[in-house]
């Protein structure tokens, strides 16, 4: 029996006027798999993540989650934990931001909020207004937001940028725990190949809107050569 894919990106194209930003892109992700999306600035990694999350519609092709087209079934993306430019109310505390989000999702999450703030080492700052947070603290609070409800698929855009070494390790361990302990697939974009090498199972590379590589991490030498050829082409 073949692998069952939880998420399928099928021949997705994104076009703005006459400009093709993303060209006929396909990718499949299995349960419990950690996939890194890499590429240079302007490689439309975030564009692809926005399409997968249902924030932007593809010009052609489709994204399926659990066999359902997310454009036709937008409510299914409620199972996604997403960290793409997290949004906060800066004038209230970290705790209040999470409580407000839990009210919007109609779930009482007092215990979960405490667990997440402790896990991300923000508990000592739970009463502090978000406007007083550093960038790294806001990233960690964003992680709390996307894990507040039960997550079936985790999507992170450049999660390690701006983090100190402790923050990086915290994010990496969270990703590993989600995939290996809860069998939740994780898709994250990154520029840092060291971070990619450390935690992911598979590398997918985009360059100039086209998929250039889709390879298991065990073939590291092959994908490193491919990256170098693409960068210096």
Specify the residue positions occupied by each region the protein language model found.
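The feature captures the beta-strand-to-loop junction immediately N-terminal to the Walker
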Residues: 38-40
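Catalytic Walker B motif of ABC-type/P-loop ATPase nucleotide-binding domains
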Residues: 154-158
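Conserved ABC transporter NBD signature motif
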Residues: 61-76
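ABC transporter nucleotide-binding domain
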Residues: 172-233
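Conserved ABC ATPase "signature" region
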Residues: 99, 110-125
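Helix-to-loop junction immediately C-terminal to a conserved catalytic motif
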Residues: 53
